[in-house]
């Protein structure tokens, strides 16, 4: 399954909005080289050059060569993306992931309901004449 150039562009700009283009370019470069990449002109410590290549040349995707260079970086990009941004890429939009997200939402709702119930018991015990201010409230 191929990830569209526009989707990679979107997540990289979103990550750069949070961390900065230089940070993202450096992280991609380090991961690309760690994974054995060496074909692209990315050099550790050359933050400005790496940022220029990734964000201001290749990510534009105006030519086939630019898009191909970004495709070569995809394994490194996937490795550095935080979970909040990975979902924007089609390869992560699976039935299993949707089920896990639904379960996560259900768990969050259950936790909120639990906390609301504890708060209601506490309020009733302390503010409705159900006890003096020295009484403790125990919830099991």
UniProtKB/Swiss-Prot annotation:
Record's function text: Transcriptional regulator that causes a severe detrimental growth effect and reduces cell viability. When expressed, it alters expression of a variety of bacterial regulons normally controlled by the transcriptional regulatory protein RcsA, resulting in deficient lipopolysaccharide biosynthesis and cell division. YdaT has no effect on Rac prophage excision. Overexpression of ydaST reduces growth and leads to loss of cell viability. May contribute to toxicity and morphological defects.
UniProt miscellaneous comment: Encoded in the Rac prophage region.
Name of the gene this protein is made from: ydaT
Name recorded for this polypeptide: Transcriptional regulator YdaT
Conditions for induction: Not expressed under normal physiological conditions. Expression is repressed by the transcriptional repressor RacR.
Record key words, sorted: Transcription, Transcription regulation
Gene Ontology BP terms: FtsZ-dependent cytokinesis
Domain of life the protein comes from: Bacteria
Mutant lacking the gene: phenotype: The toxic effects of racR silencing can be observed in the ydaT deletion mutant (where YdaS levels are elevated), but the ydaS-ydaT double deletion mutant shows complete attenuation of the toxic effects of racR silencing.
InterPro entries, alphabetized: YdaT_toxin, YdaT_toxin_sf
């Amino acid at each position: 399954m191929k990830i569209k150039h526009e989707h990679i562009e979107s997540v990289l700009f979103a990550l750069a909005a949070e961390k900065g283009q230089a940070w993202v370019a450096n992280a991609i470069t380090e991961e690309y080289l760690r994974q054995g990449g060496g074909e692209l002109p990315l050099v550790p410590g050359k933050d400005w050059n790496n940022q220029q290549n990734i964000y201001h040349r290749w990510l534009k995707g105006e030519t086939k060569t630019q898009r191909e260079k970004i495709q070569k970086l995809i394994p490194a990009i996937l490795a550095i993306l935080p979970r909040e941004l990975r979902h924007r890429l089609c390869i992560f939009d699976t039935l299993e992931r949707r089920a896990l997200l639904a379960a996560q939402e259900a768990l969050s709702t259950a936790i909120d309901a639990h906390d609301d119930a504890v708060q209601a018991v506490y309020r009733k015990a302390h503010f409705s004449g159900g006890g003096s201010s020295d009484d403790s409230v125990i919830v099991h």
